[in-house]
């Protein structure tokens, strides 16, 4: 007898379940997606012990006909595709026909379903074996219960995490599905306690508000773009609202939540230098495209996809986000906690500014000595001395703050997570949703005022680190190092992008010794390094020498810049000339900028603020830290109880 044998269906289902049903969250995902494919508009999810004891999904969808109930639990049985052509034009969430038999093979499953045209069907399955099938009275839709998950696979059960962790995985999946399909009302219960309820009215802002809070929803800006192949819609937070994890970014492709690192990277690139290192935005991006352009048949879990025009999509995402941020002022409000203000037309009046357009990048003309004393005379190229600013004689109108209650960005030591349980305090569902709709409806669109910085008039300096300035719109606090870092960065970024013939010879050639692997890596990229003005000559078997450098290299930092470029070339799998220039410009701008505890004269402060206004992004340094924080006059009045 031969050694190779065909496995029976039950064993095959157990093997398939290892990929499809990894944990309770996998069961919830597959069953809820089936409900959505069945045109459900309302879905209830009931859990006990984070789904390990019981998972129950109730929907009002199309239901399953009696003759299809048994077939639905056979391997690769599906109503969603018929031939290989359908496989490349998938519009549904499910299509493989693996989920139901896999779930049934590792649990005790009970199904009650009806199409509404005939009596319902009651089906009981244990470990893949059909125990009972009978007709029953049932409303239209499907009610499916999964109990004792992994009862017959103790090895899999042993690797389950704590109840809290498994519940977190489930809520994370349900949140993503809720964002993907705001037109479907979702209710999530755990041990009879309600964790989530969405209205199903199609407004994704309400879903985002119910998941992340009204305060976060107020800091969202809409994103929308369209090309020949792609349509993008969504919301992302202002740069001041960040989290310590990428888990707050959700990407949806043709209604399907997917985990795709390159899409998340594109969102981050869209923020460019607006985000601090190690911080990530909250974002929801829905992408619609021809199914022929995306392959969803990559993994049984259907969370991974491949794009046939990936680079075009990534470029569209980056450009769309960058364009959106250029249209708004990104000065974070310091904010004070206030009660919900009355709607006052005077409060809602926004100050308008007329600014000069940023001029072509040039090296900042502020002359600052490395060591400075308050009593020393300093040199500055400002033609007119700064004078204390006198406010115009006019009746003050408090400006509108985007969100009074929101605090400016602060790195939180305990960031909130998507997996945090949320309990709804009201027992009246309609009241809860009406209240949420009202709050979301009151969220005002963030005004697109352009990216110009209003004129600022210095009034002082604190600890040789922070500059205080004012204008009609209130008080501004500026980080002087971050401000000049932004000025220098835009200067060096422009210079690094040019290959100039003007070079400075080194008195002693700089020698770079590398390992053989590093040497070969750098040797491959010699032409790329020339594009940033760095010319290397081979010297021996594993070394290079540099005899000259561009004249714009900051004096005394030549070798550090060369070493930084070498490190980037060795570290990156594929050298990106744009990133190489970026890293070099960031490093040079940081080292060339004034530091903390360095006192400036009024003229130097005024010159610094004027230079800052000429930059294309005066709101964050190249590392993403905020340059300035705004206290509106209205907020200051509130702090001192001058207005109520």
Swiss-Prot record:
Keywords for this entry? DNA damage, DNA repair
Q: Where is this region: Disordered?
A: 340-425
> Entry's InterPro entries?
DNA_mismatch_repair_CS, DNA_mismatch_repair_MutL, DNA_mismatch_S5_2-like, HATPase_C_sf, MutL/Mlh/PMS, MutL/Mlh/Pms-like, MutL_C, MutL_C_dimsub
Cellular compartments per GO CC: mismatch repair complex
User: Which GO biological-process labels does this protein carry?
Assistant: mismatch repair
Composition bias, kind Basic and acidic residues: at what positions? 340-360, 416-425
Where composition is biased (Low complexity), the residues are 387-400
Which GO MF terms does the UniProt record name? ATP binding; ATP hydrolysis activity; ATP-dependent DNA damage sensor activity; mismatched DNA binding
Q: Which HAMAP family match?
A: DNA_mis_repair
Record function comment = This protein is involved in the repair of mismatches in DNA. It is required for dam-dependent methyl-directed DNA mismatch repair. May act as a 'molecular matchmaker', a protein that promotes the formation of a stable complex between two or more DNA-binding proteins in an ATP-dependent manner without itself being part of a final effector complex.
Q: Which family does it belong to?
A: Belongs to the DNA mismatch repair MutL/HexB family.
Protein name as it appears in the record? DNA mismatch repair protein MutL
What is the gene called? mutL
């Amino acid at each position: 007898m031969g050694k190779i044998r065909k496995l029976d269906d039950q064993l095959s289902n157990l093997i398939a379940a290892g990929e499809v049903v990894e944990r309770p969250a996998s069961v919830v995902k597959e069953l809820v997606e089936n409900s959505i494919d069945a045109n459900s508009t309302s879905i209830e999810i009931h859990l006990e012990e984070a789904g390990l004891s019981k998972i129950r999904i109730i929907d009002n969808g199309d239901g399953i006909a009696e003759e299809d109930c048994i077939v639905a639990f056979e391997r690769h049985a599906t109503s969603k595709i018929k031939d290989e052509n359908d496989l490349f034009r998938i519009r549904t969430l499910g299509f493989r026909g693996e989920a139901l038999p896999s779930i049934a093979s590792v649990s005790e499953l009970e199904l009650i379903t009806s199409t509404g045209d005939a009596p319902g069907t009651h089906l009981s399955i244990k470990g893949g074996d059909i125990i009972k099938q009978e007709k029953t009275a049932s409303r239209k839709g499907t009610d499916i219960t999964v109990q004792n998950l992994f009862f017959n696979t103790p090895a899999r059960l042993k690797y389950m995490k704590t109840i809290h962790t498994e519940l977190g995985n489930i809520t994370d999946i349900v949140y993503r599905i809720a964002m993907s399909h705001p037109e479907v009302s979702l209710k999530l219960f755990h041990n009879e306690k309600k964790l989530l309820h969405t209205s199903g009215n199609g407004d994704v802002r309400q879903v985002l508000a119910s998941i992340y809070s009204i305060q976060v929803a107020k800091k969202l800006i809409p994103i929308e773009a369209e090309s020949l192949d792609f349509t993008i819609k969504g919301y992302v937070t202002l740069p001041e609202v960040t989290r310590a994890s990428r888990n707050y970014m959700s990407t949806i492709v043709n209604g399907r939540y997917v985990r795709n690192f390159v899409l998340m990277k594109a969102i981050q690139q869209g923020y460019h230098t607006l985000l601090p290192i190690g911080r990530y935005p909250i974002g929801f991006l829905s992408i619609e495209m021809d199914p022929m352009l995306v392959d969803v048949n990559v993994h049984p879990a259907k969370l991974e996809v491949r794009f046939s025009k990936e680079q075009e999509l990534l470029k569209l995402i980056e450009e769309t986000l960058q364009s959106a941020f250029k249209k708004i002022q990104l000065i974070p409000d310091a904010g004070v906690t206030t009660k919900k203000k009355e709607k006052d037309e005077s409060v809602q009046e926004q100050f308008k500014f007329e600014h000069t357009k940023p001029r072509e990048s040039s090296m900042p003309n502020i002359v600052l000595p490395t060591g400075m004393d308050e009593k020393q005379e300093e040199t500055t190229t400002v033609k007119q001395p700064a004078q204390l600013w006198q406010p115009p004689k006019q009746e003050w109108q408090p400006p509108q703050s985007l969100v009074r209650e929101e605090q400016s960005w602060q790195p939180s030591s305990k960031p909130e997570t998507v997996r945090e349980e949320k309990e709804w305090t009201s027992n009246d569902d309609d009241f809860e949703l009406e209240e949420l709709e009202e709050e979301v409806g009151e969220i005002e669109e963030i005004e697109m005022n352009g990216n110009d910085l209003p004129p600022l008039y210095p009034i002082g300096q604190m600890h040789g680190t922070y500059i205080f300035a004012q204008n009609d719109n209130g008080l501004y606090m500026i980080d002087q190092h971050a401000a000049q870092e932004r000025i220098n960065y835009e200067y060096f970024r422009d210079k690094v992008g040019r290959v100039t013939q003007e070079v400075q010879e080194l008195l002693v050639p700089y020698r770079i010794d590398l390992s053989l692997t590093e040497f070969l890596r750098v040797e491959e990229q010699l032409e790329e390094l020339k594009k940033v003005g760095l010319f290397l000559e081979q010297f021996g078997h594993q070394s290079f020498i540099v005899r000259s450098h561009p004249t714009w290299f900051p004096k005394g930092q030549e070798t550090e810049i060369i070493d930084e470029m070498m490190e980037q070339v060795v570290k990156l799998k594929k050298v990106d000339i744009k990133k190489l220039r970026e890293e070099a410009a960031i490093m040079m701008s940081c080292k060339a900028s004034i530091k903390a505890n360095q006192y400036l004269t009024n003229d130097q402060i005024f010159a610094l603020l004027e230079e800052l206004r000429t930059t294309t992004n005066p709101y964050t340094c190249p590392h993403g830290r905020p340059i300035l924080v705004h206290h509106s006059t209205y907020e200051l009045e509130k702090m001192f109880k001058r207005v109520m």
